[in-house]
Amino acid sequence: MEKVDIFKDIAERTGGDIYFGVVGAVRTGKSTFIKKFMELVVIPNIENESDRQRAQDELPQSAAGRTIMTTEPKFVPNQAVSIEVDEGLEVNIRLVDCVGYTVPGAKGYEDENGPRMINTPWYEEPIPFHEAAEIGTRKVIQEHSTIGVVITTDGTIGEIPRRDYIEAEERVVNELKEVGKPFIMIINTVQPYHPDTEQLRQSLSEEYDIPVIAMSVESLRETDVYNVLREALFEFPVLEVNVNLPSWVMVLNEGHWLRQSYQEAVQETVKDIKRLRDVDRVVWQFSQYEFIDRASLAGIDMGQGVAEIDLYAPDELYDQILKEVVGVEIRGKDHLLKLMLDLSHAKIEYDQVADALRMVKQTGYGVAAPALADMSLDEPEIIRHGSRFGVKLKAVAPSIHMIKVDVESTFEPIIGTEKQSEELVRYLMQDFEDDPLSIWNSDIFGRSLSSIVREGIQAKLSLMPENARYKLKETLERIINEGSGGLIAIIL
């Protein structure tokens, strides 16, 4: 990621105002970090000569030893400066140097009268040093910063050992987490690549769940600054996560078990995404589901806080669902092609009566209009009307008429006493409330109730005589072709 992209993305997330709140314990190198940051990134990009000189004059002072140098909060520069990072891309930058949390061994936060009193921009009266550190940290991050930077150390930069910084370090991190702004941690060390430093970096990152970078602030380079910005960018919240399911899964009905499983997995997993940094971890979590072969990050828009994730299903799952949908096991490509041909033929036939079927279900009567291919045209015939002549064109086309008829089937077994009948009713109704359809599976005299009823309905359907069917067809033809609206039916 180039520096222009980093600044552009951060500017989008912060509204163009990149304000760093630099916090931490005393004697960790906060002022040195601000000074180096300004000299490397900000001051060289200030076009106005007077603004550049003013920013140079307002750089904080830093020195080695145990004596505290920053005794009051300081804005660097005092007024935010606008720098042009690239053509058409201007950002406002300002850093805030906070009063550090006190640590054992540091000098300068007490005088002969007790705790040293500090002047702050937030109170007219001076307040004690430790109070200025706590209030200043919260106010700087909450009101004057878009990004927080916690500076700590492994103890190699001065005379104060690492153990003396731990309590102050924990207080700062907890304070920042309460505020809720994105922040990162820098370990200021003279040995950034030493195994012990790397071990400390990893342990702090795991303990605080934030990005931790080990570097020598005194030897800060421009690439280090952009690394800090890049890591800070990943701490911004995710505003939108788009998860793309396999295309063939999206074809399934919303109520299908597999599609529901995917949707539940997405809902369960993406709820853990809060920061851009969480996206990679969530992508890995998706891969743990048995119905997801793999997941990949399709793209991430740092500036907009939008992530896009692609999910892929196992090939064997596709075969399983295909078998489930088609109803038969697919034995190979030839078998699949034959099934597709059969289904294609069936679909052509079904499409001709689909509207009629829908009508008959809704109203009890449906008509399937004939297709052009079904029409037969008789030979044109000359006709005469008085002194005038014309041509008679006659076409015949079959139309399919569907009538919904409710067929009743009654089953009345005579089994004995009234008590025995009551027991049969209880037996039939025992699971009816939980599963009404279960009554059809009830066993009556060695047969299921469904088979008995089905047999009764089938018997009634076959009772309609052949000549009655023909007469019914003939009657419909006359009504339609002759336009008769009246019908008298006599059933013998």
Swiss-Prot record:
Cysteine pairs forming cystine bridges in this chain are none
Q: Where does ATP bind?
A: 24-31
Q: EC number(s) for this protein?
A: 3.6.1.-
Record carries keyword Nucleotide-binding: yes
Keyword field: ATP-binding, Cytoplasm, Hydrolase, Nucleotide-binding, Sporulation
List the record's Gene Ontology CC terms alphabetically.
cytoplasm; endospore-forming forespore; spore wall
Per the entry, what this protein does is: ATPase. Has a role at an early stage in the morphogenesis of the spore coat outer layers. Directs the assembly of the coat and exosporium to an area around the forespore.
Instruction: Please report the name of this protein according to its UniProt entry.
Output: Stage IV sporulation protein A
Lineage of producing organism: Bacteria, Bacillati, Bacillota, Bacilli, Bacillales
> What is this protein's gene name?
spoIVA
